[in-house]
């Protein structure tokens, strides 16, 4: 059980804002700093809001159309009038009325995730037909009846994210991007991806570690911002003792900048002093991965449970054309590493040369941001096309900013004149180092979700490459929370024979993907276990007697919460599934103890 605690019952949440709304050509828009009707939501004598009706009237008095105001409130709620005003001004900047160009108001609403199975076969070209931007705005008002119910659902989602320590504005943006139906794990995924992209990471740094590093990663200076957020305490560890995860009892773990780990391919090894304690030495080797940008104290806790080994933080942008900030705790040797050949391209233009023809000069992106589990919808790409179609030459700076923000947020690529599209699953497979069609056979939605939660194979293979000479005759692997088999693919690409793999993975989709790949490429034994709770002490001992022990215990990223009960959220050890981290520790400890006794 999770026990939420607070340093003070009177804690207040105060979030930084991104600044004042930009000026725009909103009709009859007055100076919001001048005397006159307030832009804040009217309140009663008790200080409570009078409701959205008064807010609609307020913005209508400023000259915004009612349909546009209702659409904006429906998308982001009415709790933040400044953000509402900014959204309305954005509508003005990209269209001049509720539509962008002549697109319908509904098509120009802020982005929400569409993950219905009917969307799986979306033909992105169908929105590029002549006259598609000639639709006239229409609304029968039927959707407004459910309006306030949706807002209530959104408030509940926001409350959950805020209680997890995320800034309120970032929680709002994540819900806008992924939709109300998106699970909290997907929303957390989206927030971290946005933070890695720089879209809002500056909003509040008080829960994150901000550190300057030397060239290797030795600490030069660490600064922390004191926040006034509520603190959290988590439930029992494996021994039943209360373990705090709020960082209040932990020395913060510094994050290096840049995140290059102990070494990069084709670069000399940095001067690294890495003395592993005796209890951390193999057999077996172990390797544990988690998202780097975890809340303060989480990495210190993980390190403490894994023999006080310091994490190796790496951004996969040094291995491929997409960023992916991760931390790895392992007892592997760090000398004589070698990359998998051929090395993948590290820029978008090298990875997808066909995009060069359509890439505008005002789009400076050279690499993708962190690949997400949720994709942009066809409605968004249509809105962008309509916005750009209004200009015969270079669009205005306002429109450029709008388009670039969406392209960075959703990793959109240019596939035609004024036409962007999300990455296809096979393109994500290529960027992440998987063989083509590795995830083919399941729905598009499931492919995106699985790939967005997977290892970047080239990065992991570089770390595991030291095992090639140590196990020339093959190895036995215990793969915990295997996902779609990133570790197995990495070992295969290194030419390391896997004699036996015990794979623990809750998601049936992921197990199907791994089993299909295994049957096509491997000759060893694959044993799949659907629930980590089924990997009992007795079964571990049986496997060790049967196969002679394990050479590697490798754990998938706890941010990969595909099945809802198989992985942690992106905040590392947050929420009801935090016990899975202790399952990794429990299993590793028992493997080590049993093997030492054999």
Curated annotation (Swiss-Prot):
Per the record, the domain of life is Eukaryota
Q: Which UniProt keywords apply?
A: DNA-binding, Methyltransferase, Nucleus, Repeat, S-adenosyl-L-methionine, Transferase
Enzyme group, top EC level?
transferase
Task: Give the coiled coil ranges.
Answer: none
Provide the protein's localization.
Nucleus
Q: Where is the composition biased (Acidic residues)?
A: 114-128
Q: Where is the SAM-dependent MTase DRM-type domain?
A: 272-598
What Gene Ontology terms for biological process does this UniProt record contain?
methylation
For the region Disordered, give the residue spans.
1-49, 114-146, 227-252
Give this protein's Gene Ontology molecular function annotations: DNA (cytosine-5-)-methyltransferase activity; DNA binding
Enzymatic reactions: a 2'-deoxycytidine in DNA + S-adenosyl-L-methionine = a 5-methyl-2'-deoxycytidine in DNA + S-adenosyl-L-homocysteine + H(+)
Which EC number(s) are documented for this chain?
A: 2.1.1.37
Question: What residue stretches are annotated with the UBA domain?
Answer: 42-91, 150-194
**Disruption effect?**
Pleiotropic developmental defects such as growth defects, semi-dwarfed phenotype, reductions in tiller number, delayed heading or no heading, abnormal panicle and spikelet morphology, and complete sterility.
> By its UniProt entry, which Pfam families does this protein fall under?
DNA_methylase
In terms of SUPFAM superfamilies, this protein maps to:
S-adenosyl-L-methionine-dependent methyltransferases (SSF53335), UBA-like (SSF46934)
- What GO CC annotations are associated with the protein? nucleus
Function (record text):
Involved in de novo DNA methylation. Required for CpG and non-CpG methylation. Required for normal establishment and maintenance of RNA-directed DNA methylation (RdDM) mediated by small interfering RNAs (siRNAs). Regulates proper plant development in both vegetative and reproductive stages through DNA methylation.
Please give the family membership noted in the entry: Belongs to the class I-like SAM-binding methyltransferase superfamily. DRM-methyltransferase family.
Summary of subunit composition and partner proteins: Interacts (via UBA domains) with EIF4A.
* Protein name per its UniProtKB record: DNA (cytosine-5)-methyltransferase DRM2
Species source reads Oryza sativa subsp. japonica (Rice)
Q: Which gene is annotated as encoding this protein in its UniProt record?
A: DRM2
